[in-house]
């Protein structure tokens, strides 16, 4: 498990400067340049201070895009492994354990291979960015800033943040994550 105890918080301006210094810009990405593998653990708390809506949106996308692409790479690797395992007549104990873990991770009955094949599939990048932008207010919502919650997933039992002014009959919370990468990982499920 990754350790995030020694992370630092960057403000929006410092994050922008970091991306500029590394030559990471969306125009180049749109023209086919690879996305820089820069993985921030949390969003800048002062995204709204940028003032310019386009700058805020671009910075948000530059933060979230590498996280989504990284998760997609892991999903691709899992998908390759799944199809390799399924192509064999006999599976090793390790392969059976791996399959059992994927069934549990994706919350699928451990006999439904068809459903597992459908579920272990990449996250459509544009949809993930759009949902993260919508659910997190382009990274400015309380849930995003306090709990690294990009996608607004609800929970009734896990650690989460209670919505303010919620209906007293409602018992849900918004899932809270230690780092942004965990929010993206949970989104695939």
Q: Which residues does each predicted region cover?
A:
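Catalytic cores of secreted/periplasmic lytic hydrolases that degrade extracellular macromolecules
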Residues: 1-130, 134-189
